[in-house]
Amino acid sequence: MKDFHDVYNSTLNEKEELPTLFCDMDMVLVDFLKGADKEVGQSFVKMDNAKRWATIHKNKTFWENLDWMPGAKRLWSFVNKYGSHILSAYSTKDSNCVPGKMKWLRKNLKLTQRSRIHLVRRSQKQDFAMTNNKPNVLIDDHAKNIKEWKSKGGIGIHHLSVSTTLNELKKLGYK
């Protein structure tokens, strides 16, 4: 029969063995499209590529002032208990993107630990799928990122809503 310490230690070990979480920003935590549509005055995705990015670039504080996605504070509160990392792609079309995202993280998540913030090119996200031959978990709204992550051995959660993402995390052992 297991005593209290056996149960306690096995619980600790289970928690320690959970994969590292990586959470995307745009359209998971941050409502990029709502902010972009507002900034360009029409549908960002339907607008000419060069014009839309030129408009975004003119607003130096665009990235740092984006709104939270609905329910994203609840998602962050859950994943942050496990020391979740941020893994977000930056745009090469706007030099304000990286500093703006850093300001958003500092202001909204109070996240300043550079070791937990990874702003990379989209194609580089998959490079974080494994650590020491152990899979990590990516929460991302972009199906291509999830596919690439899984192909590198990671565990991908295609973010469609906060409730489905939280359910997937719970299935993986996050409480």
Residue spans for each PLM region:
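Charge-dense, intrinsically disordered terminal/linker segments
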Residues: 1-19, 68, 78, 103, ...
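Active-site neighborhood of HAD-like aspartate-dependent phosphohydrolases
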Residues: 3, 7, 11-60, 151, ...
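Conserved Lys-Pro-Asp/Glu-containing loop-to-beta segment of HAD-superfamily phosphomonoesterases
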Residues: 20, 117-144
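Short catalytic/ligand-binding loop motif for oxyanion handling, primarily in non-cytosolic enzymes
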Residues: 29-33, 38, 84-86, 93-97, ...
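Short, acidic loop-to-helix structural element flanking the phosphoryl-transfer center
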Residues: 48, 57-86, 94-99
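A short, structured active-site edge motif that brings together acidic residues
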Residues: 85-95, 102, 106-127
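Acidic, Mg2+-coordinating phosphoryl-transfer loop and its flanking beta/alpha structural elements
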Residues: 134-171
